[in-house]
Amino acid sequence: MSSQARTQTRAGFKAGVKDYRLTYYTPEYTPKETDILAAFRMTPQPGVPPEECAAAVAAESSTGTWTTVWTDGLTSLDRYKGRSYGFEPVPGEENQYICYVAYPLDLFEEGSVTNMLTSIVGNVFGFKALRALRLEDLRIPVGYSKTFQGPPHGITVERDKLNKYGRALLGCTIKPKLGLSAKNYGRAVYECLRGGLDFTKDDENVNSQPFMRWRDRFLYVMDAIKKSQAETGEIKGHYLNATAPTTEEMIKRAEFAAELDAPIIMHDYITAGFTSNTTLARWCRDNGPLLHIHRAMHAVIDRQKNHGIHFRVLAKTLRMSGGDHLHSGTVVGKLEGDRAGTLGFVDLMRDDHIEQDRSRGIFFTQDWASMPGVMPVASGGIHIWHMPALVDIFGDDSCLQFGGGTLGHPWGNAPGAVANRVALEACVQARNEGRNLAREGNEIIREAARFSPELAAACEVWKEIKFEFETIDTI
């Protein structure tokens, strides 16, 4: 380099390290309608000022690095940088804050959940200045959400495909989840569907193991579906898990399911990844099957209150990536989930416009710009005594999935399915008559059991089963 060039470089660039807050903490900034907004729960290391920590979050999740670099002068940092535009202490928590960051839309590739998450949460969570960090919520602007296809079909189209209206859908996960042969698996599916369920389901870890290869399972299951449809006159389905080691193999399995006229297939969206999920969602829209999404591995990411990503963010990103169903917890079953928080992200899955409501953990107003909704699936440790609460909490646009609560019936799978269908229809009728499900739920179930021996037997088996543990992740 010539001496003249060195002189010019020294004149325009000063090497060294400067505080993040000098560039990335901008409390005077007013977010734009086109900005992606993020709310982080931030716990600084002792001695680190919260404004410096907030600025570091904005910097490390956008354009910043640990030192000043001369290439900063080759672009417009003011245009592309993330901005921490405020923070507030978390009530009842010591040295913990909600930090708000605005990201300009140009930082993100259109239609890519993978790129968006890589930018916002890909690196900053390991930053030493932070003791813990959790992404609580995102506001996706209309201009960005319109670059996503979203769910392949959505709730309204699903109801039309199934010709089922005015009640929640009923499902069941086949148990034991592993170890059945394909033929016995198909037999279990048939018994559940003929008893009155709308769907049965592969468990999340049923892929293509030595005891039951995927092709054999698909064939026996479709046999069961067609037989049960012929007997009941209702449209039935089974969530055929197309999750596979490679995207190419996943599409191969999906195509085989479509050749068999399978109405719905399934994907494990977190373990398989967002790129894989978006690929399958687009394929489903083009080829017809509904897409059921399982959230296997979510609790590794979302269960800790102080560090990770809240499930409401994972639910939003799934709606963008694509899925017609998504497991959402139950509130009353065996899995983690408080009522207010669960209802908050259920609305974010289903509704077109959701107002800010901090009491339900919703930090930002979200407008989905007519993107189709995702049907929440309540699953995990539920049985007929939970039915009134489930109908009250989730309403009609949901799928209530009873695994052990169907297959554990003392008379077998079909009577277990009958018990669930009778309980559901009794609760829907009572609600439509104006009765209070929360207060009269047990009485409604007992009244229905007088006319259904299958339901009466189920009431006796599960009368003492409760899952009363304190929720770890509360608002």
Curated annotation (Swiss-Prot):
Gene3D superfamilies noted in UniProt: Ribulose bisphosphate carboxylase, large subunit, C-terminal domain (3.20.20.110), RuBisCO large subunit, N-terminal domain (3.30.70.150)
Cofactor stoichiometry and binding remark: Binds 1 Mg(2+) ion per subunit.
Main localization (coarse): plastid
CDD domains associated with the record: RuBisCO_large_I
Cited PROSITE patterns: RUBISCO_LARGE
Enzyme kind, highest EC tier: lyase
NCBIfam families named in the record: PRK04208.1
Family listed: Belongs to the RuBisCO large chain family. Type I subfamily.
Protein name: Ribulose bisphosphate carboxylase large chain
Organism per entry: Cyanophora paradoxa
Gene name of this polypeptide: rbcL
